[in-house]
Regions:
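Helix-driven interaction modules
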Residues: 73-156
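Alpha-helical repeat scaffolds in large eukaryotic proteins
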Residues: 5, 9, 45-53, 69-76, ...
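Amphipathic alpha-helical segments in structured regions that serve as interaction surfaces
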Residues: 1-24, 67, 116-119
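N-terminal interaction modules that seed assembly of large macromolecular complexes
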Residues: 10-58
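Alpha-helical rod/repeat scaffolding segments in eukaryotic adaptors/tethers
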Residues: 26-30, 61, 129-132, 136
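Eukaryote-specific, cytoplasm-facing alpha-helical/coiled-coil scaffolding segments in long proteins
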Residues: 27-32, 65-79
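Residues within HEAT/ARM-like alpha-solenoid scaffolds
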Residues: 35-39, 66, 80-83, 87
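Short, solvent-exposed secondary-structure capping/transition elements
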Residues: 49-64, 80-84
Length: 156
């Protein structure tokens, strides 16, 4: 979400807060936020379980779907739209069928969420196309920080 808001702020300039009075724009941001969150959560679960399997002999990767669904089901309390939850669960199931737990953690594990940020950001397509590389790299760099924190936390 932070990356989405920073991207919007950068693209809109100093008057970006004025757009928060626009209900249509707010609806777009909210939809983008939840779609990005859903895929980022998928990436994080896949990364975490893959990393734990490889480096800590974690054998319960079959719990991935249950973990994801439990988190999303709780997000309805925070306003996550049910239709986004249903689509996200379907996408998770499809991705889960293809995952190789032994290599996921090292094979562009957060690429899907970076692409989702790019896809859902409510920015004009002609401007977005100019920003593609910057947006994707920005998201990947943010995830690098998370990966470092995760590695430190599990060593404690």
């Amino acid at each position: 979400q932070v990356t989405l808001y920073n991207y919007l702020k950068t693209r809109m300039g100093t008057k970006w807060v004025l757009h928060f009075d626009d209900e249509i724009f707010l609806t777009s941001i909210n939809k983008a936020k939840w779609n990005i969150y859903a895929v980022a959560l998928q990436d994080l679960i896949f990364y975490s379980l893959s990393y734990l399997k490889v480096f800590h002999n974690y054998q319960e990767t079959d719990k991935a779907n249950g973990i994801y669904e439990e988190i999303l089901d709780k997000e309805t309390k925070n306003g996550m739209p049910k239709e986004i939850i249903l689509l996200a669960k379907e996408k998770f199931t499809e991705r889960l069928k293809k995952i190789d737990w032994n290599i996921y953690y090292k094979s562009w594990p957060f690429n899907e969420s970076a692409l989702t940020l790019y896809e859902w950001a409510p920015i004009a397509e002609e401007l977005k196309s100019l920003d593609r590389k910057i947006v994707l790299n920005s998201m990947i760099l943010k995830w690098d920080n998370i990966k470092d924190e995760f590695a430190k936390l599990i060593k404690i």
